[in-house]
UniProtKB/Swiss-Prot annotation:
Glycosyltransferase keyword on record: no
Keyword Repeat: yes
UniProtKB keywords: ATP-binding, Cell membrane, Lipid transport, Membrane, Nucleotide-binding, Phosphoprotein, Repeat, Translocase, Transmembrane, Transmembrane helix, Transport
Entry protein name: ATP-binding cassette sub-family C member 10
Reactions performed catalytically: ATP + H2O + xenobioticSide 1 = ADP + phosphate + xenobioticSide 2; an S-substituted glutathione(in) + ATP + H2O = an S-substituted glutathione(out) + ADP + phosphate + H(+); 17beta-estradiol 17-O-(beta-D-glucuronate)(in) + ATP + H2O = 17beta-estradiol 17-O-(beta-D-glucuronate)(out) + ADP + phosphate + H(+); leukotriene C4(in) + ATP + H2O = leukotriene C4(out) + ADP + phosphate + H(+)
Main location: membrane
Purpose: ATP-dependent transporter of the ATP-binding cassette (ABC) family that actively extrudes physiological compounds, and xenobiotics from cells. Lipophilic anion transporter that mediates ATP-dependent transport of glucuronide conjugates such as estradiol-17-beta-o-glucuronide and GSH conjugates such as leukotriene C4 (LTC4). Does not transport glycocholic acid, taurocholic acid, MTX, folic acid, cAMP, or cGMP. May contribute to regulate the transport of organic compounds in testes across the blood-testis-barrier.
Record-listed Phosphothreonine modification sites: 464
Length: 1501
């Protein structure tokens, strides 16, 4: 090496690279070190910018600065080549040897040519509007000192003095021209550039039409390795422009969901094993990364080994210089290559993880679209999407570690064998003995994990139901009861989590304490084998055993990750193995035999479960001709809806066959419970179909929606909220019907669309829609309002799941009507069992929200997102949640743990100094009295640990010199073992305390969130999609439970580790602390630049999860409608679009993590390499102190590793704290229902304040938002105790607002409400609602038993429950389901809609409330049952005050008085007979129109 260098430079082999020649630097040193190396760096940096994405618009005009820089760069690439021409002249005319000049000139020319190309690329990118990257410009000036020094060299050589030789003079002229070109380049860079082009026009951003560039694709390999392509994204993050998912860069082609779905589907088929399909799709690429992992792992050992060799070279001083140079270059190169390889490995593994993630999530959604009748609860499916998919994909990071860590272990053990021989087996046996212990722990963790996930499923499912029925829960004051159920699930979940956390703590403690125990065991064995312990053996063994910490500590986590992946894989596989909806297998492949037949069923038996255990539906034979109107009637729960579900394929067909004509065109389906999307009314009706203005107008008219749209603030552009929350029941039914009609199908299945509307609207729907627009189609209509079936072609009578009669209406209808032909007698309206109702009086469930919406019609606001660093109050909130005392104890235990660890290091240093003092003059330390060399062994022997290794302190030898006898060794070992034991106890204490603190924080944060949300007003839920709330209860809570404590633990360990290292540095080598400020500044700048983007990307990632949750929940709710309309493909595309937005944020956050990692790694490598290089130069000058150099190198290695870990763990912890921030946002900022002051005499008045039941409204005004019209405008009336009051009025008249104000779900702006002369605003909400009862129009049931649904608070005996069921005609159903403990299923799915309404009525029968509010709750029951129920209500509540929002006239005309509302005012209040006798009363007009509606039904018969 020296010879080659001497030959290249023309120097002596003893000094091949002289630093000084005369009064200036050596020419060879100048050309190689000061010129060639900076030019090589310039070439590399320039190459990184060659792939800079171009702008999409036309090329901008070059400003003068860019032109000057381009021209200067091009000239600087030409001049070195011209400079080579004088080289051919005689030797005297050139300053250095031939090949040195050729090498330097070629490197310079290539560098500037590459730089010219890079500038050209930057000019045509958004950088063209500014000066471009600063780093690139600074690199261009790095070679300038070499030019200046070469010019000085010429001056010293007298090149300008006569005789002037043409060769040297020409070279000087070219040198001056090069300096001038560099100056011109500087002026070009200094010229003012315009403001940087806004990135909103960048192809990385904004609308799809402009997004032509894709992240990473098309970039150079240098740009990929350095992540230079991320610069625009990071710049936007620093400027605060990462506001929405589209602000991130587009996905590379290999990560796009559409591409990945195609790749995965090629290997996936129904019933296949998920892991096999994933392996076939992505396995080869993933396994190939193992090679990268292995090379990176092997190179990881090069650093410590080469450092040891370098210290040996400096210490011995006998090896040639070339060896030292090779060690330094090997150290630098090995560290850099290892950093790049390991970084690329991490990046590629994350990319494979993202690929598999899209495949899994797409497959889950596709399966959800194909689910058969046996469907898991929505909460469980959401958990598969949020929790299990993430845990499954942790496999990607764990698998390669599972073999990589044992490889590191094997290499370390081999090196240990080299030091202590067979004694290392004693330590190995001890380590192996802990494996079965670890196996037991891992098995317990896995079992607890499965149980915890089951409890989590139950909790999320319960929350889903709770959110869907929050209005009824508040009416019935069940917040406490259902909140307790959620808390019970959470307690069970935390119980399993507690087991997991403490087992994890035990696992970590065992492996953390293991190295010390292994060391002591090895040393004792070594002595017993008859060997003499020496400092060399002790410290080398300690260093090597410390290298075992990483693989031994990480291995349990890796195994745990693999086990968790297996658990989640099994859960996902079970979901994927559920029976699928298969039209090909369900329907007969042949159409009906007769062309005129639309539908035919023969000997068909159906059930909701595949084995027929639930109620069956049997159709012996049914043939429906094309164009017929078929009515389906029967008692509640007889199987009417099941028949329609059987036709649409939503049941299991056990036998027989079903044939449908033109099956591929699908069905027009209007379900009994209307399914409405969170979108505008127009979007709900169009349902993905192209807008046809003429057809759209016809559909609106046919479905009687024009009047409703004229009331709504933005017409058909009004957003209706999740599940149509801002609409009345009738409006939802009509929009669902309009959606079906707009699809223009041949076969329509209409499940009771007339139940929720009044007689006039029902009449309109019958004549304009069912008999009008749909007259040319085949229609099957289920209804209890039999008066509207007189025009049917045929009527089917269902009973107990069987089709018992088929015939014309005149035969079938009398069998089910309460009073036949009730419409025949006009004068018997008041007493007949028929139910005429008031024109256009359907209830508006959410009148307040209809008004509350802004004129743009937008109800649901974009989810808010915090910006900037995670605020300090979030950390304080987590501290408080953990408990101040517990948090302080954790910090104290951490500091004690670090102090004892440093104490152990100090004791080792003291032992070494005593050994060296006792062996003064030995060959190993001829200068033991020198303070600088007292720790000579420590750097040499402790360099094997690449991180978190604290080299012993440089301690002054004590006055007492110790011998190296065995007794002394034993003494030092005992003291060391004692200190290590104390450290072990502190470690255990810290692990246990931290587990307890994490559990306390998890419990506290969830409790606060749940309590706050249960106390939120209904307006919050109406404007907040449930997906947002569920996202917090699922993903964010899971993060607080698991991910955050794990990362916070690492952060705290790194922090106290850094404090301990700084303490060692400050006492051992104080001058080294001078390097910390600049190093800290660089680290802080890099991580600050990174954190600004990563924070926002993490938030955007959380933000884009919520729509995925909502979309999946929405899909599961509307599955029959989707499939009937053939919209599954469109919904799958929407899922891919939402998934792409989330994938963008995930990919960008992963890429930014790797961007930070490579920079921190390279900075650490640069620090170590620079110190090694300086040491080599000092060694050549005879100034190096080997011991000091070794210390510096080992400290540098530990310090950079710790700083990297600290930045990384802090950033990831901050990202996880976003989950705490989101929980705190809802725990603190969600509005709360008002809490009133207690009454003056709480004991007496609270018991007896409502004894009679009078209700009085006094000038009540309700305004939902300033500037909007009054919903209630000075309403005044009084209801006497025991009085029955009917409430009627048109849509938007304020009927529902009365109930909302009465129950204080909304607070009035003026006026007051009195109950028995007590102002309700002075009462606590629970106190008020406990005295009121409500029967809602829409039934709400939650999963659980009949008992839990009837009496959630457990206040009544079984006898009372059975009595209520008997009165509601549900006792037989309850017995068939297994009595009061029979399960109802999710949202009561085991009951028909009518049976659910009856069960809600049974609740009201149990109440002791003095005031009952009824919102016509029997719309979905047959007329005979309805008549009996009305009699039951009249009898049961005879002495109670009853307020009824009327839909059927029998509930009004039997009332004592009727209240008529119009535009929020009371216009009439009198008895029904008095109002009917007033010829111009509004009530009389409504009554007349309702009678006309009733008569028009059969008029055509």
């Amino acid at each position: 090496m020296e010879g080659l260098l001497a030959q290249l430079c023309g120097t002596d082999a003893a000094r091949p690279l002289p630093l000084w020649e005369g009064d200036t630097t050596g020419h060879c040193f100048t050309q190689l070190v000061l010129s060639a190396l900076p030019h090589a760096l310039l070439a590399v940096l320039s190459a990184c910018h060659l792939g800079t994405p171009r702008t999409t618009n036309h090329s901008p005009a070059l400003n003068p600065g860019w032109r000057l820089r381009l021209a200067a760069s091009f000239l600087l690439s030409i001049f070195p080549l011209l400079d080579l021409l004088p080289v051919v002249l005689p030797p005297g005319s050139r300053p250095g040897p031939l090949w040195l000049e050729v090498l330097a000139g070629c490197v310079t020319a290539v560098a500037w040519f590459t730089h010219s190309l890079a500038l050209w690329a930057l000019v045509h990118s958004p950088h063209g509007r500014s000066r471009g990257p600063l780093a690139l410009a600074l690199a261009a000036f790095l070679p300038t000192p070499a030019l200046v020094l070469t010019l000085l060299w010429h001056c010293q050589r007298g090149t300008f003095l006569p005789p002037l030789l043409p060769g040297p003079l020409g070279r000087v002229c070219l040198l001056i021209l090069q300096l001038a070109a560099v100056l011109a380049y500087g002026l070009g860079w200094a010229a003012p550039g315009g403001p940087q082009e806004p990135w909103t026009h960048d192809p990385f951003l904004s609308s799809e039409s402009q997004e032509t560039e894709v992240a990473e694709d098309g970039e150079s390999w240098l740009s990929r390795f350095s992540y230079a392509w991320l610069a625009p994204l990071l710049a936007r993050g620093v400027r605060g422009e990462l506001q929405q998912p589209r602000d991130t860069c587009r996905l590379p082609r290999r990560l796009h969901p559409a591409f990945l779905a195609r790749v995965f589907q090629a290997h996936w088929k129904e019933g296949a094993q998920l892991w096999r399909a994933l392996y076939r799709a992505f396995g080869c690429c993933y396994l190939a990364l193992g090679l990268l992992k292995m090379v990176g792992t092997m190179l990881g050992f090069s650093g410590p080994l080469l450092l040891s060799l370098l210290v040996g070279f400096l210490e011995e001083g006998q090896e040639p210089l070339s060896h030292g140079l090779l060690y330094v270059l090997g150290l630098a190169g090995g560290t850099v290559i290892s950093a790049v390889l390991q970084n690329q490995y991490g990046y590629e593994v994350r990319k494979v993880t993202l690929q598999a993630r899209v495949a899994v999530l797409s497959t889950l959604y596709r399966k959800a679209l194909k689910l058969g009748p046996s469907r898991p609860p929505t909460g469980e499916v959401l958990n598969l999407l949020g929790t299990d998919s993430e845990r499954l994909l942790n496999f990607a990071g764990s698998f390669h570690e599972a073999w990589g860590l044992p490889l590191q272990l094997a290499i370390t053990l081999y090196l240990l064998y080299q030091q202590v021989g067979m004694a290392f087996l004693a330590g190995l046996v001890l380590a192996l003995l802990l494996v079965p212990v670890n196996k037991v722990i891992a098995t317990r963790i896995m079992a607890s994990n499965q149980e915890m996930l089951r409890h989590k499923d139950a909790r999320v499912k319960l929350m889903t139901e709770l959110l869907s029925g929050i209005r009824v829960i508040k009416f019935f004051r069940w917040e406490q009861a259902l909140g307790d159920r959620v808390k019970a699930c959470r307690t069970k979940e935390l119980g399993r989590l507690r087991v997991i956390k403490y087992l994890d703590a035990a696992c970590v403690y065992l492996w953390a304490a293991l190295p010390v125990v292994i060391c002591i065991t090895i040393f004792i064995t070594y002595v017993l084998m008859g060997h003499q312990l020496t400092a060399t053996k002790v410290f080398t063994a300690l260093a090597l055993v410390r290298m075992l910490i990483l693989p031994l500590n990480n291995f349990p986590w890796v195994i745990n990750g693999l086990l968790e992946s297996k658990v989640s894989l099994d859960r996902i596989q079970r979901f994927l193995d559920l029976p699928s909806y298969s039209p090909e297998a369900y329907y007969s492949p042949d159409p009906p035999a007769e062309p005129s037949t639309a539908l035919e069923l023969h000997e068909a038996l159906f059930s909701w479960d595949p084995i027929g255990a639930s109620q069956k539906t049997f159709i012996s034979h049914l043939q429906v001709k094309k164009g017929m109107l078929v009515g389906i009637v029967g008692k509640v729960g007889c199987g009417k809806s099941s028949l329609l579900a059987a036709i649409t394929g939503e049941l299991h067909r056990l036998c027989g066959w079903v044939a449908v004509s033109e099956l591929s065109k699908g069905f027009g389906l209007a379900t009994q419970e209307p399914w409405i999307q969170c979108a505008t009314i127009r979007d709900n009706i169009l349902f993905g179909k192209t807008f046809d203005a003429q057809l759209y107008r016809e559909v609106l008219e046919a479905c009687a929606l024009n009047d409703d749209l004229s009331i709504l603030p933005a017409g058909d552009q009004t957003e209706v909220g999740e599940k149509g929350v801002t609409l009345s029941g009738g409006q939802r039914a009509r929009i669902a019907l309009a959606r079906a009609v707009y699809q223009e199908k041949a076969l329509y299945l209409l499940d009771d669309p007339l139940a929720a509307v009044d007689a006039d609207v029902a009449n309109h729907l019958l004549h304009r829609c069912i008999l009008g627009v749909l007259s040319h189609t085949t229609r099957l209509l289920c209804t209890h309002r039999t008066e509207y079936l007189e025009r049917a072609d045929v009527v089917l009578l269902m009973e107990a799941g069987q089709l018992v009669r088929t015939g014309p209406p005149s035969e079938i209808l009398p069998l089910v009507q309460a009073v036949p032909t009730a419409w025949a007698e006009k004068e018997q309206v008041a007493t007949s069992g028929q139910s005429p109702s008031v024109c256009d009086l359907e209830r508006t469930t959410e009148e307040e929200l209809e008004v509350e919406q802004s004129t743009c019609g937008c109800l649901v606001q974009e989810e808010s997102k915090s910006e900037g660093a995670v605020a300090l109050h979030v950390y304080r909130a987590y501290w408080r949640a953990m408990g101040s005392g517990l948090a302080a104890a954790i910090l104290v235990s951490l500091l004690l743990m670090q102090a004892t660890r440093n104490g152990a290091d100090w004791w080792l240093a003291h032992w070494l100094s005593q050994l060296k003092a006792g062996r003064n003059g030995s060959r190993e330390d001829p200068a033991s009295c020198s303070p600088g060399s007292t720790a000579l062994f420590s750097p040499r022997l402790l360099l094997f640990s690449p991180g978190n290794l604290y080299t012993p302190l440089l301690s002054t030898p004590l006055h007492k010199a110790a011998s190296n006898g065995t007794a002394d060794v034993h003494f030092y070992l005992i003291v060391y073992a004692t200190i290590a034991g104390v450290n072990s106890l502190c470690t255990l204490l810290r692990a246990v305390l931290f587990a307890a603190g994490a559990l306390q924080a998890a419990a506290s944060l969830h409790h606060r969130l749940l309590h706050r949300l249960l106390m939120a007003p209904v307006t919050f839920y109406d404007s907040t999609p449930s997906g947002r709330v569920l996202n917090r209860f699922s993903s964010d809570v899971a993060c607080v439970d698991d991910s955050l404590p794990f990362l916070l633990n690492i952060l705290l360990a790194n922090s106290v580790g850094l404090l301990g290292l700084l303490a060692v540095l400050g006492s051992g080598l104080p001058w080294l602390l001078l390097l910390l400020p600049p190093l800290s500044f660089v680290y802080y700048s890099v991580q600050g630049y990174y954190r600004a983007s990563f924070r926002e990307l993490r938030r955007l990632g959380s933000l884009t999860w919520s729509p995925l949750y909502s979309h999946l929940a929405d899909t599961l709710a509307g599955l029959p409608v989707l499939r009937a309309a053939g919209a599954t493909y469109r919904f799958e595309e929407e899922n891919q679009r939402l998934l792409e937005l989330n994938q963008r944020c995930q990919f960008a956050s992963y890429a930014t993590m790797q961007w930070l990692d490579i920079r921190l790694q390279l900075m650490g490598a640069a620090v170590v390499s620079a110190i090694a290089g300086i040491a080599l130069v000092q060694h050549q000058q005879g100034l190096a102190n080997p011991g000091l150099v070794g210390l510096v190198l080992s400290y540098a290695l530990s310090l950079t590793g710790l700083l990297s870990g600290l930045v990384s763990s802090f950033t990831q912890t901050e990202a996880m704290m976003v989950s705490v921030e989101r929980l705190e946002e809802y725990s603190c900022d969600v509005p709360q229902e008002p809490h009133s002051q207690p009454l003056q005499s709480p004991h007496q008045q609270r018991i007896s304040w409502l004894t009679q039941g009078s209700v009085e409204f006094q000038d009540v005004v309700l305004v939902y938002r300033p500037g909007l019209p009054n919903a209630l405008d000075g309403v005044t009336f009084r209801v006497e105790p025991g009085e029955k009051l009917g409430i009627v009025g048109r849509t938007g008249s304020g009927k529902s607002s009365l109930f909302l104000v009465l129950f204080r779900l909304l607070e009035p702006n003026a006026g007051r409400v009195l109950l028995d002369n007590v102002d309700t605003s002075q009462l606590e909400l629970a106190e008020l609602r406990s005295q009121l009862a409500v029967i809602p129009q829409e039934p709400f049931l939650f999963s659980g038993t009949i008992r839990e649904n009837l009496d959630p608070q457990g206040l009544h005996e079984d006898r009372a429950l059975w009595q209520a069921l008997e009165q509601c005609h549900l006792s037989e159903v309850a017995v068939a389901m297994g009595g009061l403990d029979g399960e109802l299923g999710e949202r009561g799915q085991n009951l028909s809609l009518g049976q659910r309404q009856l069960l809600c009525l049974a609740r009201a029968l149990l109440t002791d409330a003095k005031i009952l509010c009824i919102d016509e709750a029997t719309a979905s029951v047959d007329q005979k049952t309805d008549q009996l129920l009305q009699q039951t209500i009249c009898k049961r509540f005879a002495n109670k005050t009853v307020l009824t929002i009327a839909h059927r006239l029998n509930t009004i005309l039997n009332s004592d008085r009727v209240l008529v509302l119009q535009a929020g005012r009371v216009v009439e209040l009198d008895s029904p007979s008095a109002l009917r006798n007033q010829p111009h009363s509004l009530f009389q007009q409504l009554l007349q129109s309702s009678q006309q509606g009733a008569h028009s039904g059969p008029s055509g018969c």
